[in-house]
C-alpha cells in the first residue's frame, strides 16, 4: 500500500485530528490560518480552535492578485504564474505559523486550503446555458503540500458545481454540522467582502436548511477607501462613514440590481458588486460629485439594507431566532448598528464566539471541517439540492511527495 494511503487510513482512525484550515477571501487582507483539533464527524463533530492567526498580505501580493481578480479579461500568463506562486506563498505562511506556535509539521494530519478566488461566475451572472456555473480558485494544493510537507486537501468548490450547486456558499456544510441547535433557530451571518447567511432551524431538518449569498459586505466600501484614501485599506471603525450623510438617490440606485429580487439560494461576487457598479449608480443618481464621506455613509447603509432584508426574509415565518455574526463586518460599528435597527425581530446580534468559534477564524475553521469530512465523513448524508446543497464529499487530496 502506498505510504500516503496508509497515512490517510491512520488519520481517519484517530480519535482526533489536527487540521489546519486556510481561508483567503475576496477582501484580500490576509491568509487566515486556523489550527483545529477535530473529533468525530458529521453532526457529532467537536472542534477545538487550538491556535489562529491572520498573516497579512503585503502590497505586492495584493497588486498581483488584483491584476487578475474579478475581471472578465486578464493576462493568461499572469494567471498561470500566480497559481503555483500563491500555493507556495500560502505554504510558507503556514510554516511561519507552525514555527510561531512551536508545532511540528509532522503533528498535522492535513491542511484544508480554500485557495484564492479570482473569478466566480454562476449561470445567472453570465447567462450562457451551455457552460453552466463556474468558479476559479488559484493557489495550487500540490505546491502547498510540497512546501509544508503536509498532506493538503483543496479545490473544494469544483465538486459543489459538478454536483449541481453554484460553488458557493460552502459555509452551510460546516454551519449545519457544527452550529445546529435543538434549542433555538439560528441564522449564521458572515460579512466578508461578500455577505452570506445560513439558516439553521432548531428542528435540524436538512430540507429546511438553506444558505445564500446576500450581496456586498465590505467589498465596495473597502475598494472605495483604497482608491480615494490610499494607503488606507478600509474605513476603520466606520469613522469616515459616520461623518457622512446618506444620499437616498444613490442608495436607491444601488439597490436596483436584479440580484436582490432573486429567491434564495443565489451567489454573487466582486465581479458584480465593485467600483464600476458604484460608478453606474452614481451616474444614474447624478451623485458623481458627492463627498467621499457621504458615499461611504451610503455604501454602509446599502450593505446593511441588503443584509437586513435577507435576514428578515429568511426568518419571515419564525417567532424567535438568534443571529450570530462573523467576518470583517463585525468590526464595522455603523454597519452593525444599521443591521440591528433594520431587523425589528432581532434584539441583539452576537458573534460566533458565543458558540465557541472566533468570528475572525470561522471561515478557515469551516474548511477544516470540510477536510475532516473528506477524511472520515460520509456516513451522515446531508444535502438539499433544491436549496443548492448537493450531498457530496468535497476536496482533492495532494500528497507532499
From Swiss-Prot:
Enzyme class (EC, first level): transferase
Pfam families: AnmK
A single GO BP: amino sugar metabolic process
UniProt pathway: Amino-sugar metabolism; 1,6-anhydro-N-acetylmuramate degradation; Cell wall biogenesis; peptidoglycan recycling
Catalyzed reactions: 1,6-anhydro-N-acetyl-beta-muramate + ATP + H2O = N-acetyl-D-muramate 6-phosphate + ADP + H(+)
Gene3D superfamilies: 3.30.420.40
Sorted UniProt keywords: ATP-binding, Carbohydrate metabolism, Kinase, Nucleotide-binding, Transferase
InterPro entries: Anhydro_N_Ac-Mur_kinase (IPR005338), ATPase_NBD (IPR043129)
EC number: 2.7.1.170
Residues noted as binding ATP in the record, renumbered to the chain: 25-32
Keyword Hydrolase: no
Gene Ontology MF annotations: ATP binding; kinase activity; phosphotransferase activity, alcohol group as acceptor
NCBIfam families membership: PRK09585.3-4 (NF007149)
Function: Catalyzes the specific phosphorylation of 1,6-anhydro-N-acetylmuramic acid (anhMurNAc) with the simultaneous cleavage of the 1,6-anhydro ring, generating MurNAc-6-P. Is required for the utilization of anhMurNAc either imported from the medium or derived from its own cell wall murein, and thus plays a role in cell wall recycling.
Family statement drawn from the similarity comment of this UniProt entry: Belongs to the anhydro-N-acetylmuramic acid kinase family.
Designated name of the protein: Anhydro-N-acetylmuramic acid kinase
